[in-house]
Amino acid sequence: MNWFVEGLQGSGKSTLIEKLSGKYPDHQVFREGDYNPVELAWCAYVSKEKYEEILDTYKELRQEIEEKSYEEGSRRVICYTKIITDVPGFHKDLEQYEIYNNRVSKEDFKRIIFDRYRKWNSDKMILECSLFQNIVEDMILFQNASDQEILGFYEELGKVLADKKLHIMYLASEDVAANINVIRKERSDDQGNEMWFPLMLGFFNESPFAKAHGVSGEDAMIEHFVHRQELEQRICREIFPGRYTVLKSKNYEDSELDV
């Protein structure tokens, strides 16, 4: 079985992954930013030619880049956020080669995701936010897609995944605002300066969705998260019936993991 761990930011995905990993020690864990057979968040996705160009540009990081790169046919996946360096502009430069945030066309976005899922035929994996979070977030905030368009996307993807062994563990937040407040504190530095929240809020405020709807600020972002959670659970019900479990965020029993 492959376990897809989903839920909003701050819902407790890391803790659930640890529990599943302990329960299934023979399963491989894939967290955000890791090389992942189906998900490309926090990774650059480039042609062989562009890859060689990047190696030439960052000669001093050649070994580190090669160690964090993976070949997929004519493409290369670079897990650049896993490379610790103080080389100016390196991470910002490679960020442009991600597939999210309108960096590729809608058509290429869909093709890349579907192609990787079609080729995926593995078992015994635990995957963090590899099915919903980044795709749904992108389609809402950057493609300005309607709920129906997103459901249509997943209806097609569901057919691709019909014969694959998977179960979705969805962490549902009963109080989204409270959960966000918790991670605001957790993701602050030693002086109490918030590190994550200002970046997330800026990301939301600058998105095509926010600009098109004339919204911004914390309340609007929370409203977006509430909507996203409702939509993701609807996808579970309509596209993946019998293949998901909804757990109360940070308030479930270990026995509920037995499916």
Residue ranges and their predicted role:
Residues 8:
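P-loop (Walker A) phosphate-binding loop of NTP-binding proteins
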Residues 65-161:
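Glycine-rich phosphate-binding loop used to anchor ATP phosphates in small-molecule kinases
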Residues 195-259:
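NTP-dependent small-molecule kinase module
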Residues 128-130, 147-202:
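Conserved phosphate-donor/acceptor-positioning beta-strand/loop module used by diverse small-molecule
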Residues 14:
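Walker A/P-loop
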Residues 21-76, 139:
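Conserved substrate/cofactor phosphate-moiety recognition/catalytic segment
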Residues 11:
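ATP-binding Walker
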